[in-house]
């Protein structure tokens, strides 16, 4: 058990970054959110109720260095695009507590929706094996693709254009 954090970090670093396209229905989920700049604590994020906008789902945890490195980029992307896309961060619990996640988003003044996956069901349903992983869900609720590893603002912008073009 003491080697689990090291193993997870190695999986993340050795996997590199990659994008994969998908076309299956995104498994629905509801998570209770942490308090962020734009969201109140205990608000529920329900993927099915996202108003026909595409949704970007980021799977992360606080002791994951690439997860932490990409969070400010995702937040900047969210601030620039929040009228046209939903963004939600889903924290893996186990290595870090929910309190660790809440403390991180508060300390970093994160704006987008962030919450925990207490039983790991969302991560399992999305087949998450590498952290961070970012999943792109189109406005019809289909998974358009996913990115494994740290993501850049440029890649987020490119994926948003693809999601928007797919809707037209």
Residue locations for each model-derived region?
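C-type cytochrome heme c attachment motif
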Residues: 62-69, 133
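A short beta-strand-turn-helix
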Residues: 30-55
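Structural microenvironment flanking redox-active thiols in thiol-disulfide oxidoreductases
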Residues: 68-108, 118-125
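Short pre-active-site segment immediately N-terminal to redox-active cysteine/selenocysteine motifs
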Residues: 53-55, 60-63, 130
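Thiol/disulfide oxidoreductase modules built on the thioredoxin-like
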Residues: 103-110, 118-161
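N-terminal targeting signals for export/organelle localization
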Residues: 1-38, 145-146, 157-160, 168
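A generic structural signal for alpha->beta connector loops
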Residues: 53, 84-85, 111-112
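Hydrophobic beta-strand anchors of alpha/beta hydrolase catalytic cores
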Residues: 56-57, 87, 134
């Amino acid at each position: 058990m003491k080697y689990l954090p090291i193993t997870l970090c190695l999986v993340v670093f050795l996997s590199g970054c990659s994008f994969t396209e998908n076309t299956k229905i995104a498994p629905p989920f509801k998570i209770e959110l942490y308090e962020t700049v734009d969201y109140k604590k205990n608000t529920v994020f329900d993927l099915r109720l996202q108003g026909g906008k595409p949704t970007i789902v980021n799977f992360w945890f606080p002791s994951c260095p690439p997860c932490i490195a990409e969070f400010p980029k995702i937040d900047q992307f969210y601030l620039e695009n929040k009228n046209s896309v939903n963004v939600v961060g889903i924290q893996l619990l186990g290595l870090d507590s929910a309190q660790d996640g809440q403390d991180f988003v508060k300390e970093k003044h994160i704006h987008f929706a962030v919450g925990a996956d207490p039983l790991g069901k969302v991560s399992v349903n999305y087949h998450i094996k590498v952290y961070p992983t970012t999943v792109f869900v189109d406005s019809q609720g289909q998974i358009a693709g996913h990115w494994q590893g740290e993501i850049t603002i440029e890649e987020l912008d490119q994926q948003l254009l693809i999601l928007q073009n797919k809707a037209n």
